[in-house]
Amino acid sequence: MAANYLHGVETIEKETGSRPVKVVKSAVIGLIGTAPIGPVNTPVQSLSDVDAAQFGPQLAGFTIPQALDAVYDYGSGTVIVINVLDPAVHKSNAANEPVTFDAATGRAKLAHPAAANLVLKNDSGGTTYAEGTDYAVDLINGVITRIKTGTIPPGATAAKATYDYADPTKVTAADIIGAVNAAGMRTGMKALKDTYNLYGYFSKILIAPAYCTQNSVSVELEAMAVQLGAIAYIDAPIGTTLAQALAGRGPAGTINFNTSSDRVRLCYPHVKVYDTATNAERLEPLSSRAAGLRARVDLDKGYWWSSSNQQLVGVTGVERPLSAMIDDPQSDVNMLNEQGITTVFSSYGSGLRLWGNRTAAWPTVTHMRNFENVRRTGDVINESLRYFSQQFVDAPIDQGLIDSLVESVNGFGRKLIGDGALLGFKAWFDPARNPKEELAAGHLLINYKYTVPPPLERLTYETEITSEYLLTLKGGN
């Protein structure tokens, strides 16, 4: 405000007109699971496979390293990782486990990786070997190496090992779901609520590989997706048949697919990937690969693109064969899509492709928001505008404020139309929806509407066999 009296010159800075809207991040995966090492019940930002290394190697039973490998097969991506395995709690003990050092390599392997508190004795138990003097140990992978200058005899020497090891079978659905502990700290998936204050964004794609097949976990993932404006990717259990997957959409089903939420994407079946540790194929949840693909499509094409009909990376096959023909409504993949289940299309020359555009809202909800890309585009628009509008909160309600808001929002819409994210957009101030009583209470309402381009899910050619072009025939000279 200007001074009452000034013998001189002053400048008063004013802010008027529209302001740009910052788009929120969409390609962020929230991963809840188990790792052999790494922070416990803490949301950790992972931006690459280098960051992923802090959660250890891919070991049987641990879900986080496998899921991170699936995501980073698509390149870089942002993953918020919550490891719920606490080695001080989720542990078992191996007592006097027989181990034998290989005569050629001088190495012995424990039956369980992610070990701790190792005590190694000779076969009779009379001599305790010293780490660093007699042997070196890789506790993560469970490999003991004989030191040549130590007291462990060379050759195929037998020994006995007693140790604790991180046991993922001790992790329960309650651990994955999480809670607020006595110290007021969130654990499990509930810690996803803390990420905005930590990193400035929320996860928009939620996965809990292996654990999401439990109905108790899947319903909590759905609830978290609603709170965060995200989509939860949920798998059917390993071994689920096609008939069981379809039946699971109803109340008589025996699996976790009975939902009509537009915050859930149902994934079936599991996929096969190559396991370097065993030199063989193993099954992996489709949700991990689908989440990595979704993030990649967001970055390469845009969040308004469907991730369906895109190549799955790192996948060698599917758990069970599914018939897939582009023109057969009775094919297995089409029947799954018809019931709102995302699957894998594998036909001659097609490769392995993610197949399915719709969330679990289909077929109950016929509004176009049952398309995942439509739902997610709406989420990005709505959240971006909410965060952008903070700068206007508590400003005086006047015509300048209303004009700035409407023009800013319309400018955002024009940008999205130019990007190809929208077909149309309009924001406006409606005096009839803003009575003086509401304005007097400090409440202002701005309307906006938009249209997201739906994916081309069904293409129909209408053809006619006609004789009319016979008239183009001409006689010779």
From Swiss-Prot:
User: Do the record's keywords include Cell cycle?
Assistant: no
Chief localisation class: virion
Query: What top-level branch of life does the organism fall under?
Result: Viruses
Localisation per UniProt entry: Virion; Host cytoplasm
Q: Which GO cellular component terms are attached?
A: host cell cytoplasm; virus tail, sheath
* GO BP, sorted A to Z: symbiont genome ejection through host cell envelope, contractile tail mechanism
- State the function annotated in the UniProt record: Polymerizes as an extended structure around the baseplate-tail tube complex. During ejection, the sheath shifts to a contracted form, thereby making the inner tail tube protrude through the host cell envelope.
- Write down what this protein is called: Tail sheath protein
According to its UniProt entry, this protein's organism is Burkholderia phage BcepMu (isolate -/United States/Summer/2002)
